[in-house]
């Protein structure tokens, strides 16, 4: 018989065997202590395996696969749709692809813009007509600054006469009156999605429709693996003051060729044939400026760009911190992280801050837009 007090065995094993045999009296003198020793070692290994496996998995996830924002591959799809192309074969053969992907990309750019909308809002009104329209509807920026309420006026195209208005103050006011409602309306849609997101996250159990909605939003914001923290950072508004400042800078307060001919408010590039070639482009450059059917499409593409592109990741992190600290967004701080938007870098961000301050654009950051007659009708 093997001596269980053999000093060659580990001390704690000898103590365990001695205690187990003496206290329980379930092993007779004829029982092979060698087998008992093997059983104990195997049991210890099994217990260690199931204890260490979860800890090892968490370590690998934390160290080897940190929670990074996934680069937005949907921006490439967006450009393809804008160019009128079908999604490429690699996307179509992807097992995660379904037939609604192309419709989703198009829908996310143009939203609820239908052919009927294009016919109505796509008409270019003269500046004199717009002045009268705003007067008849009591829509003035002075009232907006005081009452913090904007009228749901949707203008599809900028008037050609903008560049002919000699009074700089009047030209700027007309431009803001046109652009502000479009920005507020797009932000409203994002806020509704954000409200729904947090409502779903506060539920104990999600319904099938909740999960379908989440999957749609993950795809819309270019996120894989159901990364909720990234979705919360990306699904947020663009401060109106920042958006107006960028639109003003990119279009010369609505007087540029890109804005008047292509309804492009934010100078986003495309490398397709369907775009406007910059007159001052360097030799050998192939980029063009995106064209849109109506202004609201340009606004939607702009918010999508800032909320998904990796170049503005730092801006989204700072925005999330502002949300956590006080809830209100500070456009002056956020603008500092738009240096990748233009080739001039930090010089570009300083110009934006100057535009915001000189024109008191922060007054519009807490403005609400009245619901349109169509929205009211849907509530009845």
What does each model-found stretch correspond to?
Residues 2-245, 249-380:
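Catalytic cores of secreted/periplasmic lytic hydrolases that degrade extracellular macromolecules
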């Amino acid at each position: 018989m093997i001596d269980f007090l053999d000093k060659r065995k580990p001390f704690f094993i000898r103590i365990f065997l001695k205690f187990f045999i003496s206290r329980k009296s379930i092993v007779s003198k004829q029982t092979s202590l060698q087998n008992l020793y093997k059983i104990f070692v195997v049991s210890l290994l099994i217990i260690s395996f199931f204890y260490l496996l979860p800890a090892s998995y968490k370590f690998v996830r934390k160290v080897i696969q940190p929670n990074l924002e996934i680069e937005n591959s949907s921006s490439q799809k967006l450009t393809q749709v804008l160019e009128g192309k079908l999604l490429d074969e690699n996307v179509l053969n992807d097992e995660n692809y379904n037939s609604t992907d192309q419709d989703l990309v198009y829908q996310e750019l143009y939203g609820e813009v239908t052919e009927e909308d294009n016919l109505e809002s796509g008409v270019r009104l003269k500046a004199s007509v717009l002045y009268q329209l705003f007067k008849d509807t009591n829509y003035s920026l002075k009232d907006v600054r005081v009452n913090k309420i904007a009228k749901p006026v949707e203008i599809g195209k900028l008037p050609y006469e903008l560049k002919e208005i000699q009074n700089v103050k009047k030209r700027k006011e007309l431009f803001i009156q046109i652009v502000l409602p479009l920005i507020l309306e797009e932000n409203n849609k994002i806020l509704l999605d954000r409200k729904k997101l947090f409502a779903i996250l506060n539920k104990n159990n999600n319904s099938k429709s909740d999960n379908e909605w989440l999957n749609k939003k993950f795809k819309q914001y270019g996120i894989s693996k159901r990364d909720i923290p990234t979705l919360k950072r990306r699904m947020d508004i663009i401060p109106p003051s920042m958006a107006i400042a960028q639109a003003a800078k990119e279009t010369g307060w609505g007087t540029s060729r890109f804005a008047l001919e292509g309804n492009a408010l934010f100078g986003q590039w495309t490398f397709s044939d369907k775009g406007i070639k910059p007159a001052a482009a360097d030799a050998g450059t192939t980029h063009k400026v995106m064209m849109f059917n109506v202004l609201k499409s340009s606004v939607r593409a702009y918010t999508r760009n800032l909320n998904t592109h990796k170049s503005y990741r730092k801006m989204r992190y700072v925005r999330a911190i502002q949300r956590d600290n006080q809830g209100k967004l500070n456009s002056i701080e956020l603008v500092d992280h738009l240096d990748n938007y233009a080739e001039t870098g930090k010089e570009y961000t300083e110009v934006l801050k100057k535009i915001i301050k000189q024109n008191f654009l922060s007054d519009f950051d807490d403005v609400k837009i009245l619901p349109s007659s169509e929205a009211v009708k849907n509530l009845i």
